[in-house]
Structure formats: structure tokens, C-alpha cells
């Protein structure tokens, strides 16, 4: 993705390995944040090893060379092919600058490049900023999908995206 100006710096997004130390650090920060909000049975987290599988694409958002955000999409096929958005997380000091929107746009672009026209996700009800982001991007509520079961602390969402 082309670099964008953010505050007084250059922001860019690129594919990253979940095995990178800085990516693992953000995954750990995300885990710690979510552990404060939800009990273990309501935390549907992908490990670094899970994110390293061939059907997963992980992106990193960099501000002047420093990783400040991550996001991933897992390609799945059930009744239809879709991408499941996972691990969208921005460090606290960089929130509110549109970085998560940039990550989501690039994840969706990568889905369309692969002829995947549906994007799905699970998020928690105690994350109003995330819910607002996803709704603002056109995601709508839906029933649980894949291996997910109904959970009063989870919200399941979907968006139809244009395929190239």
C-alpha cells in the first residue's frame, strides 16, 4: 500500500510474518487487552503459530519504520469462500489516527485480489470503538459462522466486498 502521511510521519502497510518479534509483541499486547475485557471462553484468539498458516495473510502498519498496528485475514471455504478478519490491533498511542481503517482497507483489497467477495469477523461487545469501525466500514451483524457458537459477549459481522 502506498505510504500515507500521518501526523508528521510516513505510514505504510506491508505483509509481515507473525514470527517477527515486533509482531509477537503486538499480539501479546492485544491478548493482554482482551483478557481484561472477556473471560477465556469468550476470547477467540489466533496464536502466532495459527497466523503463520498458509491460508492467513498478516499485515503490519508502520510509522517511520516502527510497527504500530497489525491485522490478519484467514481464507476459509465453507458454504462459500470468505475471509475472516483477525487480530486488528493498534498500539494505544497511535489510536484515533485511522490506522485500523488503513489496515482493514488493505485486508479487503487483498481479499478482492484473491476473488474472495465476503469478509467476516467476530468482535466483542465491550469494544465499542471496534464495533463502530466495522459498522462504519459497512459490516452488518450476522449469525455465528464457522466453528463459532453463540456467545452473549460476541458480535458476528459480515461485509460483501467487490471482487475485481
Spans of features found by a protein language model:
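Conserved GNAT acetyl-CoA-binding A-motif
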Residues: 104, 111-123
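Conserved catalytic-core motifs of GNAT/GCN5-like acyltransferases
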Residues: 18, 42, 120-123, 131, ...
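Active-site acidic-Proline motif in GNAT/NAT acetyltransferases
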Residues: 91-93, 97, 125
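Short glycine-rich hinge loops at helix-strand junctions in the catalytic core
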Residues: 98, 115, 138
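Terminal substrate-recognition subdomain of acyl/acetyltransferases
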Residues: 2-6, 155-164
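Acetyl-CoA-dependent GNAT
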Residues: 11-86, 91-93, 104-106, 110, ...
Amino acid at each position: 500500500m502506498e505510504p500515507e502521511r500521518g501526523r508528521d510521519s510516513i505510514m505504510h502497510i506491508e505483509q509481515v510474518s507473525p514470527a517477527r518479534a515486533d509482531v509477537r509483541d503486538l499480539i501479546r499486547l492485544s491478548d493482554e487487552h482482551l483478557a481484561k475485557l472477556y473471560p477465556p471462553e469468550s476470547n477467540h484468539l489466533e496464536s502466532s503459530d495459527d497466523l503463520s498458516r498458509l491460508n492467513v495473510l498478516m499485515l503490519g502498519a508502520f510509522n517511520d519504520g516502527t510497527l504500530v498496528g497489525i491485522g490478519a485475514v484467514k481464507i476459509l471455504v465453507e458454504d462459500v469462500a470468505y475471509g475472516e478478519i483477525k487480530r486488528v490491533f493498534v498500539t494505544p498511542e497511535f489510536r484515533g489516527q485511522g490506522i485500523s481503517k488503513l489496515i482493514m482497507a488493505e485486508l479487503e483489497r487483498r481479499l478482492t485480489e484473491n476473488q474472495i467477495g465476503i469478509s467476516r469477523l467476530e468482535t466483542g461487545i465491550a469494544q465499542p470503538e471496534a464495533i463502530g469501525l466495522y459498522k462504519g466500514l459497512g459490516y452488518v451483524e450476522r449469525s455465528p459462522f464457522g466453528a463459532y457458537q453463540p456467545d452473549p459477549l460476541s458480535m458476528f459481522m459480515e461485509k460483501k466486498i467487490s471482487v475485481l
